[in-house]
């Protein structure tokens, strides 16, 4: 009997002991910066000449690590190992699989600040963002372990007096996990452990800019007792290894988190039945958003401004849930805008390894160039009242940017930016605000700041997003509390951290015995 699930608490860094412990975590990570990490296939550590080089986005000269890069030949070897291992792993007891997750969670909990420090160095996350990422990784393992225990005996169905009917879940097969760089620990660990605890074997291809934290997680899984071959670590390029594995006839499902364009490409490729393939592949996809905070005229305006700033600029706006549009009732528009500008100008953009830094860098040069191109668009489509500047001389730093008076059909209101840029748009009334918020191909998160109960209930029904929040920001979903996933081009509405997520990695089997 396991204790009831409760999410991992965030660390209070105002407590001196916690601050010192995190600093020790940073020192430990700094002691092994620049190391080489192998591929892992069937428990065999394989070193290749071709490497993925991971650098600190806050300091391009600092090498975080070098990870061996898989070729198609090695990807094929990994597929064969995973396929063979599945024949035994699928018959393993769910209790044993859940126990591995619980042990892995305990190991990460003991090394919490070390893993967070890796995220500071490799992903450019400030302390609080890194700590939340690690806590979420722990949450996924604790939650999915418990969910598997709930599903292990199936779901009751009806039986007539002459029969005994059972409805049970069995694993799918080999899953390809393609994880993102923005939550390189939490989402990577969640996608991987959901697949393995459901009885599947895994080919893990982490994001190319953040592979070291995934390599360190492989160490955790091994220490937790995961048998060799269940999770195979195959970092590589999307065009070479990613496409090969997505197309492979032995791939049973693909779990992907990333951009809309790549997600669509995977979805299209997975739909094709290739020679030797005897099933229709399943795709579990989360693909981003164009998320809006709507501010009603009857609202706590200070809460509104703080929610917009926190949701827009947390982790430099590099969250699929980030607020990139603030749609505000015209009667309170100027007040909320001016207060948001004041709060934004108080933010510090600096080295995320320093406690108190609000914003670190963006992910890499490509991200920097893309975001700055949208800043340039913002100068044409509105008025820049805060930020608007970037500096990529040492790291990829961009100032938090507010663009005011943006038209509802402007590019800044339509296209995902994935950086610290938020567009402010004026609405005539609440219905108009909801119409603007829904005027996008995405549907991931949104928030409404309002004291009007009728408007809240209208939004609950008509604001078309997978995660809708009232009187708070639009980021920060907690595993098991706010299952996360969106509509439309935000993905397949696969609710990570929710009660139906594991079922996506399994197939239902009905057995009926005549008595």
From Swiss-Prot:
GO terms for biological process: glutamate biosynthetic process; proline catabolic process to glutamate. One of its GO terms (cellular component) is cytoplasmic side of plasma membrane. Pathway: Amino-acid degradation; L-proline degradation into L-glutamate; L-glutamate from L-proline: step 2/2. It catalyses: L-glutamate 5-semialdehyde + NAD(+) + H2O = L-glutamate + NADH + 2 H(+). It is an enzyme of class 1 (oxidoreductase). Pfam families: Aldedh. It comes from the Bacteria. PROSITE patterns: ALDEHYDE_DEHYDR_CYS, ALDEHYDE_DEHYDR_GLU. Keywords: NAD, Oxidoreductase. GO terms for molecular function: 1-pyrroline-5-carboxylate dehydrogenase activity. The active site is at residues 286, 320. SUPFAM superfamilies: ALDH-like (SSF53720). PANTHER family: DELTA-1-PYRROLINE-5-CARBOXYLATE DEHYDROGENASE 1, ISOFORM A-RELATED, DELTA-1-PYRROLINE-5-CARBOXYLATE DEHYDROGENASE 2, ISOFORM A-RELATED. Belongs to the aldehyde dehydrogenase family. RocA subfamily. NCBIfam families: D1pyr5carbox2, PRK03137.1. This is 1-pyrroline-5-carboxylate dehydrogenase. It comes from Bacillus cereus (strain ATCC 10987 / NRS 248).
């Amino acid at each position: 009997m396991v204790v009831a699930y409760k999410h991992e608490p965030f660390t209070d860094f105002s407590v001196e002991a916690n601050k010192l412990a995190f600093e020790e975590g940073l020192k430990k990570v700094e002691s092994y910066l620049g190391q080489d990490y192998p591929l892992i296939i069937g428990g065999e550590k394989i070193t290749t000449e071709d490497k993925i080089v991971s650098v600190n986005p806050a300091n391009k000269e600092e090498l975080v690590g070098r990870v061996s890069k898989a070729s198609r030949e090695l990807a094929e070897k990994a597929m064969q190992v995973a396929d063979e291992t599945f024949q035994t792993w699928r018959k393993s007891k769910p209790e044993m699989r859940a126990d591995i997750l619980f042990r892995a969670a305990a190991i990460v909990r003991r090394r919490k600040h070390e893993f967070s420090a890796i995220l500071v160095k490799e992903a450019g996350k400030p302390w609080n963002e890194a700590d939340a990422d690690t806590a979420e990784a722990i949450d996924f393992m604790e939650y999915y372990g418990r969910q598997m225990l709930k599903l292990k005996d199936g779901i009751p169905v009806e039986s007539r007096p002459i029969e005994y009917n059972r409805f049970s879940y069995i694993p799918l097969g080999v899953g390809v996990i393609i994880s993102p760089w923005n939550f390189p620990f939490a989402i990577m660990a969640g996608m991987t452990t959901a697949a393995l605890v459901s009885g599947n074997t895994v080919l893990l291809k982490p994001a190319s800019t953040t592979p070291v934290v995934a390599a360190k997680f492989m160490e955790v899984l091994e220490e937790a007792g995961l048998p060799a071959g269940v999770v195979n670590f195959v970092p590589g390029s999307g065009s070479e290894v990613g496409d090969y594995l997505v197309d492979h006839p032995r791939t049973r499902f693909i779990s992907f988190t990333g951009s809309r364009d790549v997600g669509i490409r995977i979805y299209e490729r997975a739909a094709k039945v290739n020679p030797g393939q005897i099933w229709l592949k399943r795709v579990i996809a989360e693909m981003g958003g164009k998320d809006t905070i709507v501010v009603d005229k009857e609202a706590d305006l200070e809460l509104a401004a703080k929610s917009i700033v926190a949701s827009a600029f947390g982790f430099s706006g590099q969250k699929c849930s980030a607020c990139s549009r603030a749609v505000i009732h015209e009667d309170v528009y100027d007040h909320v805008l001016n207060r948001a500008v004041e709060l934004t100008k108080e933010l510090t953009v600096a080295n995320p390894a320093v406690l108190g830094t609000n914003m670190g860098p963006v992910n890499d040069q490509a991200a920097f160039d893309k975001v700055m191109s949208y800043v340039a668009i913002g100068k044409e489509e509105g008025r820049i009242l805060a930020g608007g500047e970037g500096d990529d001389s040492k790291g990829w730093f961009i100032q938090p940017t507010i663009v005011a008076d943006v038209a509802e059909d402007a590019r800044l209101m339509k296209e995902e930016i994935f950086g610290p840029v938020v567009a402010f748009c004026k609405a005539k009334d609440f219905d108009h605000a909801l119409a603007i918020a829904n005027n996008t191909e995405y549907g991931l998160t949104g928030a409404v700041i309002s004291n009007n109960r009728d408007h809240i209930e209208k939004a609950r029904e008509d604001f078309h997003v997978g995660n809708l929040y009232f009187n708070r920001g639009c980021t920060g979903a907690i595993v098991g509390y706010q299952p996360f996933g969106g509509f439309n081009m935000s993905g397949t509405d696969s609710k990570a951290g929710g009660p139906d997520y594991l079922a996506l990695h399994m197939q239902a089997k009905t057995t009926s015995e005549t008595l």
